[in-house]
Regions:
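An acidic-aromatic substrate-binding cleft motif
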Residues: 240-300, 304-308
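Acidic-aromatic substrate-binding/catalytic surfaces of carbohydrate-active enzymes
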Residues: 36-125
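Active-site-adjacent "subsite" loops/lids of carbohydrate-active enzymes
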Residues: 268-273, 337-393, 404
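Acidic, contiguous internal or C-terminal segments within carbohydrate-active enzymes
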Residues: 33, 52, 115-173, 589-592
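The substrate-binding groove and active-site-proximal loops of carbohydrate-active enzymes
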Residues: 261-280, 307-322, 364-381, 404-419, ...
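Glycine-rich, aromatic-flanked loop segments that form ligand/cofactor-binding clefts
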Residues: 239, 244, 260, 302-303, ...
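Short Pro-Gly-centered flexible turn/kink motifs
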Residues: 45, 216-236, 651-664
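Active-site-proximal substrate-binding groove within the catalytic cores of carbohydrate-active enzymes
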Residues: 62, 223, 422-635, 650-660, ...
Length: 667
């Protein structure tokens, strides 16, 4: 068995346990059957039935086996909206062949967890002769899944077809509401969730009628095919967020993983060029302090803006005569690899203008935002640059900073937009290196469906700033977390906290007001940061500025985070708005352990009252009492506290206190 397959088996076991009622659940066995004029897919979590009466395909019903509730979905399975002419509904397409029921394909080499799991799928070929369209529809259900995915592949048989929208959900769903304000937000209804699986999708609910569609700009050319997908999932009572997260962890490009790394921004460069000697030195400093002296696993060293010569467009500056060869060798010696910042639209400020001038001289496409990734020539160049970095230097992560337009079509492009091009680019890179880490930053927003392609997205706001009261570092922490609340908690409540770029830990020479720590607040920043559960763990740190105690605090928290990854991946927001100086934090739960991190952003003492059942969103059958204690050595003298899960508990917080509690079931 390969190492990758072993890790995915461990992941699958953990998912199965977490979907239980506080205990291990039996593995769902997927059943698929055709009986008379109906097709059914089912496991112990969910069942779906479609009608194929009179040779047409239509929804019939869905059943949630956790709650025993049924959702009648009589109606169309999809709708295609042409720019001219009538809407083409699934009811107007005729089956070309009998339905095919088969095993879902399994790929042990895939980076997507779902592709490692067995399952069943139903496939139907449909045709509309008047519109000269062929549709391949399939529904897929896998082991361990609490959701059913539908894929619709459209193939034009005539010269071209100009479509304005692809509608994959159009049904009456009582109690439905869009869960968020960002594009690509799912719809929820009681213990159900529904969505079109794309970050550019849009959903609307009016009088319980749910419609989810994806705009399309380019015409579909004769012989060309394109695939879109939707999902409908069942959840347990009170467990919608957690069971939606189970879906995300199955289907995301790569399951959650701790990814600890250095970032050169604010340290080596701040719009300045740096060189190989600088880069190797910082790798050695972090490697010695964290890996050799403190046994911390480092994953990567990310070299941000400053490694390239902006007058040549994504070529190394003269200070890197051998590219990343020596940097990669140094990183590998500490068990890590190099990572690279690239900006599809060209970056920022003066270097961006230099890159644009170079691009235009070489005939690359541009648009209002800068370089146009969707341009045919620039796309090929940018893709080949990325692949070259992977092949030559073993680059294991890309920070893609800025993706340009979301709705402009470049002449000659095969993509609807720069965002569409970025999605295809990431797919090509993952095909070459499945475990590649991709951080997609500026231009993103909290749609969970970015995670079908990228590993993490930007939290929103400025890189760093200051809010609230207290020292500069305390005000930076408040600002960081106020942006999470504003742009993610309020705009996209089902986006996983575990997949945000928060702009890391900052203690660096070029970081405004964060190049020193006179108030000794660095431990608060470290403990709050790792308490978020984010997998993208960035260190914007100048090594020489840290004391031995600072390194110790950082190492302890980093190791704690990795050791508790299976719990922290459940991280969700608790409490109020940091900008209002309200107590807030994060909580996460697994059957073996729970973690609560609370922060008081005020210079006054504050109490926070809540039950563990509410904070942890405990499923039925969970422990009734938890033993709570801090994991930090500095709190080692404190005794464990027994907290009944269902009772209101008062947490007393000192000014600016960050309280971390590990909670172990004691009954």
């Amino acid at each position: 068995m390969s190492h990758t397959s072993f890790l995915f088996r461990i992941w699958f076991l953990m998912v199965t346990i977490s979907l239980g009622r506080g205990q291990a659940a039996p593995l769902p066995t997927v059943q698929a059957a055709q009986k008379a004029d109906t097709i059914t897919l089912s496991n112990t979590a969910i069942s779906a039935t479609w009608s194929i009466r009179a040779g047409t395909l239509q929804w019939q019903s869905l059943t949630n086996h956790f709650t025993g509730t049924t959702l009648p979905l009589a109606g169309t399975v999809f709708e295609l909206v042409p720019r001219e002419g009538p809407v083409l509904r699934s009811s107007g397409f005729k089956m070309v062949t009998a339905p095919i029921i088969e095993d879902a394909p399994v790929s042990r080499d895939s980076s997507k967890a779902a592709n490692h799991l067995p399952g069943r799928q139903v496939r139907v070929e449909l045709e509309d002769t008047s519109a000269k369209l062929r549709i391949t529809w399939q529904a897929i259900l896998r082991e361990g899944a609490n959701y059913i995915r539908q894929e619709v592949t459209i193939r034009a048989l005539q010269p071209s077809l100009a479509l304005s929208q692809i509608v994959l959900i159009d049904a009456v769903v009582p109690g439905a509401a869009v869960a968020g304000h960002a594009k690509g937000s799912p719809v929820t209804a009681g213990t159900w969730f529904l969505a079109l699986e794309h970050p550019l999708s849009e959903c609307r609910v009016h009088a319980d009628r749910v419609s989810c569609w994806l705009p399309r700009e380019l015409p579909l050319q004769a012989g060309q095919s394109v695939t879109y997908s939707s999902v409908i999932g069942a959840t347990r009572a009170t467990q919608l967020r957690r069971d939606f997260l189970n879906y995300v962890e199955h289907e995301r490009a790569h399951p959650y993983r701790t990814f600890l790394h250095y970032n050169s921004w604010y340290d080596l460069g701040f719009f300045d060029r740096y060189n190989e000697q600088d880069a190797v030195a910082v790798v050695q400093s972090f490697g010695e302090q964290l890996t050799k002296l403190r046994a911390v696993k480092l994953d990567s060293f990310l070299f941000d803006d400053g490694w390239d010569d902006p007058t040549t467009l994504w070529k190394f500056n003269p200070g890197f005569a051998d590219g990343l060869t020596k940097v990669a060798q140094a990183a590998v010696s500490y068990g890590a690899a190099p990572g690279i910042w690239l900006s599809p639209w060209g970056g920022y400020d003066k270097p961006k203008q230099q890159r644009l001038a170079s691009a235009r001289a070489q005939g690359f496409e541009t648009n209002e935002g800068g370089l146009a990734l969707s341009g045919p020539k620039y796309y090929r160049y940018f893709r080949d640059t990325c692949l070259d970095l992977i092949e030559k230097y073993g680059v294991n992560q890309f920070k893609f900073d800025g993706t340009g337009n979301a709705n402009e079509v470049i002449k000659g492009s095969e993509f609807d937009s720069d965002f569409d091009a970025a999605i295809h680019l990431i797919g090509e890179l993952r095909a070459r290196k499945p475990d590649l880490y991709v951080n997609l930053t500026t231009g993103t927003y909290p749609s969970p469906f970015w995670l079908l392609y990228a590993d993490s997205i930007w939290r929103g706001g400025d890189d760093h700033s200051f809010a609230g009261v207290g020292s500069n570092r305390q005000r930076w922490i408040t600002y960081r977390d106020s942006q999470i609340y504003r742009w993610v908690v309020e705009e996209g409540p089902l986006f996983p906290m575990n997949s945000l770029m928060l702009h890391g830990l900052i203690f660096a020479r070029y970081a405004e007001r964060l190049g020193s720590d006179p108030g000794h607040d660095f431990p608060d920043e470290v403990h709050s940061y790792f308490g978020t559960g984010t997998q993208l763990q960035e260190m914007y740190i100048t090594p020489s500025l840290l004391s031995a105690d600072d390194w110790d605090v950082l190492a302890e928290a980093a190791k704690w985070s990795r050791a508790n990854a299976q719990t922290l991946k459940d991280s969700h927001w608790i409490g109020g708005d940091p900008a209002r100086l309200e107590v807030y934090g994060w909580a996460s739960w697994s059957p073996e352990k729970a973690i609560v991190t609370l922060r008081n952003p005020s210079d006054q003492r504050q109490d926070f009252t809540a039950s563990l059942a509410a904070l942890l969103e405990l499923p039925e059958g969970s422990a009734r009492v938890y033993a709570a204690r801090s994991p930090w050595k500095s709190d080692g003298a404190a005794q464990a506290l027994q907290i009944p899960a269902q009772e209101q508990h008062i947490f007393h917080l000192r000014p600016f206190q960050v309280l971390t509690l590990e909670l172990v079931p004691s009954s």
